[in-house]
Structures are given as C-alpha cells and as structure tokens.
Amino acid sequence: MSGRGKQGGKARAKAKSRSSRAGLQFPVGRVHRLLRKGNYAERVGAGAPVYLAAVLEYLTAEILELAGNAARDNKKTRIIPRHLQLAIRNDEELNKLLGKVTIAQGGVLPNIQAVLLPKKTDSHKAKAK
C-alpha cells in the first residue's frame, strides 16, 4: 500500500543542538531567542547567536580560570565573590571591560599607599654596632 504514511522512508536522525554542532557549552538557541526578543534588530542571522555564545563562553571561562587561581592562592576549594573580584581587578583587560561593575561581597583590592608605609632607615644597623 504505497502512499500511506512513512513506512518505507528513512528513520529520522537524532536531533543535535546548535550548541553541540558549534562545540559550545553555552546555549545557542537561547541566545538566538534573546536576540530576537530583545528588539536589537528586525532580523537575526544564523551565525550571530553562535558567535555571541562563543564570546560569552570564552569570557566566562577566562574569569573562572583566574578566579580559580585566586581561590587556590587563598587555600580554598570554592570560588566566592571575593575571588571573582580579585581575578577581575588584577587583570588589566578584564578590569577595563568591567570597570564600572560592582561585585556584591567582593571587597576591595589590598593596597597601601607608599607614603603611609614606615620609612626604611639605617637606625637598626646603627644601634646594633
């Protein structure tokens, strides 16, 4: 009985997400939806969400790498906002990118002005002799 349904056709291939096609962890489909709903442009090309998801993934990985190093330096196994703050503010490019951003519970960078430090004198050496 030809012409009745899809009995003779090929089995449909397993669905593959656009993120996995691009080799990304960030959701390309969600980024595409947000670009469309955000009224940034009338139309959104197919490559734009892939590129944007890749950029966001790269920036996230970079920040997490530096924050992980900051956590390890402080002998901690969990990244907290303080580690994110230290990572971003100690990196010149990330600090410029996120210069106006306030990180809650981030604290400040340790910094003592040179004028306030005690003066280095030879008084200790003179008293020893």
From Swiss-Prot:
<protein>
    <recommendedName>
        <fullName>Histone H2A-IV</fullName>
    </recommendedName>
</protein>
<feature type="modified residue" description="N6-(2-hydroxyisobutyryl)lysine">
    <location>
        <position position="6"/>
    </location>
</feature>
<feature type="modified residue" description="N6-glutaryllysine; alternate">
    <location>
        <position position="119"/>
    </location>
</feature>
<dbReference type="GO" id="GO:0005634">
    <property type="term" value="C:nucleus"/>
</dbReference>
<feature type="modified residue" description="N-acetylserine">
    <location>
        <position position="2"/>
    </location>
</feature>
<comment type="subunit">
    <text>The nucleosome is a histone octamer containing two molecules each of H2A, H2B, H3 and H4 assembled in one H3-H4 heterotetramer and two H2A-H2B heterodimers. The octamer wraps approximately 147 bp of DNA.</text>
</comment>
<feature type="modified residue" description="Phosphoserine">
    <location>
        <position position="2"/>
    </location>
</feature>
<dbReference type="InterPro" id="IPR007125">
    <property type="entry name" value="Histone_H2A/H2B/H3"/>
</dbReference>
<feature type="modified residue" description="N6-acetyllysine">
    <location>
        <position position="10"/>
    </location>
</feature>
<feature type="modified residue" description="N6-(2-hydroxyisobutyryl)lysine; alternate">
    <location>
        <position position="96"/>
    </location>
</feature>
<feature type="modified residue" description="N6-lactoyllysine; alternate">
    <location>
        <position position="10"/>
    </location>
</feature>
<feature type="modified residue" description="N6-succinyllysine">
    <location>
        <position position="96"/>
    </location>
</feature>
<feature type="modified residue" description="N6-(2-hydroxyisobutyryl)lysine; alternate">
    <location>
        <position position="119"/>
    </location>
</feature>
<keyword id="KW-0832">Ubl conjugation</keyword>
<keyword id="KW-0238">DNA-binding</keyword>
<dbReference type="GO" id="GO:0030527">
    <property type="term" value="F:structural constituent of chromatin"/>
</dbReference>
<dbReference type="InterPro" id="IPR032454">
    <property type="entry name" value="Histone_H2A_C"/>
</dbReference>
<feature type="modified residue" description="N6-(2-hydroxyisobutyryl)lysine; alternate">
    <location>
        <position position="10"/>
    </location>
</feature>
<dbReference type="GO" id="GO:0003677">
    <property type="term" value="F:DNA binding"/>
</dbReference>
<feature type="cross-link" description="Glycyl lysine isopeptide (Lys-Gly) (interchain with G-Cter in ubiquitin)">
    <location>
        <position position="120"/>
    </location>
</feature>
<keyword id="KW-0379">Hydroxylation</keyword>
<feature type="modified residue" description="N6-succinyllysine">
    <location>
        <position position="10"/>
    </location>
</feature>
<keyword id="KW-0007">Acetylation</keyword>
<feature type="cross-link" description="Glycyl lysine isopeptide (Lys-Gly) (interchain with G-Cter in ubiquitin)">
    <location>
        <position position="14"/>
    </location>
</feature>
<comment type="function">
    <text>Core component of nucleosome. Nucleosomes wrap and compact DNA into chromatin, limiting DNA accessibility to the cellular machineries which require DNA as a template. Histones thereby play a central role in transcription regulation, DNA repair, DNA replication and chromosomal stability. DNA accessibility is regulated via a complex set of post-translational modifications of histones, also called histone code, and nucleosome remodeling.</text>
</comment>
<keyword id="KW-0539">Nucleus</keyword>
<keyword id="KW-0488">Methylation</keyword>
<dbReference type="Pfam" id="PF16211">
    <property type="entry name" value="Histone_H2A_C"/>
</dbReference>
<feature type="compositionally biased region" description="Basic residues">
    <location>
        <begin position="7"/>
        <end position="19"/>
    </location>
</feature>
<keyword id="KW-1017">Isopeptide bond</keyword>
<keyword id="KW-0158">Chromosome</keyword>
<keyword id="KW-0597">Phosphoprotein</keyword>
<feature type="modified residue" description="N6-(2-hydroxyisobutyryl)lysine">
    <location>
        <position position="76"/>
    </location>
</feature>
<dbReference type="GO" id="GO:0000786">
    <property type="term" value="C:nucleosome"/>
</dbReference>
<dbReference type="GO" id="GO:0046982">
    <property type="term" value="F:protein heterodimerization activity"/>
</dbReference>
<feature type="modified residue" description="N5-methylglutamine">
    <location>
        <position position="105"/>
    </location>
</feature>
<feature type="modified residue" description="N6-acetyllysine">
    <location>
        <position position="6"/>
    </location>
</feature>
<dbReference type="GO" id="GO:0031507">
    <property type="term" value="P:heterochromatin formation"/>
</dbReference>
<keyword id="KW-0544">Nucleosome core</keyword>
<feature type="region of interest" description="Disordered">
    <location>
        <begin position="1"/>
        <end position="22"/>
    </location>
</feature>
<dbReference type="InterPro" id="IPR009072">
    <property type="entry name" value="Histone-fold"/>
</dbReference>
<dbReference type="Pfam" id="PF00125">
    <property type="entry name" value="Histone"/>
</dbReference>
